[in-house]
Amino acid sequence: PSIAAIGSENTESTSESMCAVVKGYPLVIRNSDSPEKQWGIPFDAPLFYWYREEDKERQLITYMEQTFSIQPSETKKAVLAGNDAMRQFGSRLKEAGAKVLEEVEKEGRYAVVLASRPYQNDALVNHSLPELLTEFGVPVLTADSVPGIENVDLSHSRLDVVNNYHARMLASAVLAAQSQNLEYVQFVSFGCGHDAYLSDEIQRMMREISGKSPLILKLDESEVQGPLRIRVRSFLETINMRRKKREMAERLQNQPGTSRQENAGGGNECGTAALGPDIQKSWQVHELSDPYSVKFEVEDRKKRTVLVPNTSHAFCRIMSAALKTQGIRAVPLAVGREEAIRLGKQYVHNDICFPAQIVIGEALAALRSGQYVPSETAIGMGKYIGDCRLTHYSALLRKALNDAGYPEVAILTNDDVDYHDLHPGFRMNLMSAIRLAGALPMIDILEELLRKIRPYEKVSGSSDQAFDEAMDFVVDGLEQHGFSGALRGFKKAIQRMNAIEYDRSQPRPRVLIIGEYLLNFHPGANHEIERYLEKNGFEIIEARM
């Protein structure tokens, strides 16, 4: 089955999406193994949306009745029994986790939280890591066995929590950072892009709460027992050394006649200062601060220039025009190429999708140019709440800006809810959305005309010049008079494109370009594949945006 949505099990109401990769597994199996064709075995791949328990019951009753002629009353009994079994299992798991935690606290030891996806419970996937840890004498807890995990406040995470497994990993990281008796290990397999932003955020949260560092392991099908043992042993030795220093510091602080102030340094080489600042920090647990402390306020509409990265340059221009209709000083960025890619690779996790790297790289390249004052600049970034990594571009951008030395740059998105309060001074309104929706088909048509004409133009470069002028008509009309202005501009744009001289008497072979959304339309990201193919004798067909 493909389960697209499931109810939240934590404090975040948005954590209803299921993994986009896992949702596609039935299609992968059907196309790769073809059980119907190869063995004549029926292959069912029903699609379910279980936002509530009632949804699950209703959809399963319908599926079982239509597919297997099972009576609704029988299916309802089975669903209730399954729910009861899951509740009992969850209770036993929490009890076992509480027992382990109680024991290590009593004995002054520590346990390790193994944060992973469900498939990483398989010994073939995790390379028997749980057994390796217990071999070293360290108890192991799964994230969902940690007591209180469902009640952890995740509002100060940079991420929008859209998945229950993400919530488990983040919440268990918070609890591990807050406890002297818990440490943290995260599994990552096949360079999962969703785990990439989780790894970044887990490290940030744990470091800010108590100075702890997690162990992040990338485990795939290759033989890793030797390197894995070394990594785990090094991690445990680091923890043991830190705990010994902590015990020494506590003994020094508790010595009769020795004040806390003396132990904080003050020339006393035997004080806790001699143990290092990282150890001193680990004594204290801090509340997470606002991860987006720099806001786009109302006054920033006049103060800040908003830089808009590209999907396609045409879309970037109409997005900027739509923002201008709401009083935003929006500037469409030039299409990023090698420098943008380099900066994106440098400041964005390399396991995240390439589109995130290129659009963030474009913003960083613009800031590096010296053309914009950081304190008077904001970056406009696309966003929606769901299972695509686009949900987390603003979090990736915030980290990249901070790491690159631009913490004063604000972020603005098209998210009308703005859960993290990035831009209290701006909400994209319905009229702007309507203007964008109306302008999108216009640029689709203009780009399609460009692709039909450019390979056959009589004057080299005339098609690109006409397209730029045609876009000016649409953008200026949208900016000055909204949708009606864009429509009038579009009519002029069509006339301008029709004025190009071309000869299609000898049609070229046509090539369809298909791929990841941004790579299709972004010439810097796809290394000008359209022009390359046109120079080599082809006409391009492109999916419409």
PLM regions with names:
Residues P1-M545:
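An N-terminal assembly and electron-transfer interface module characteristic of large anaerobic redox
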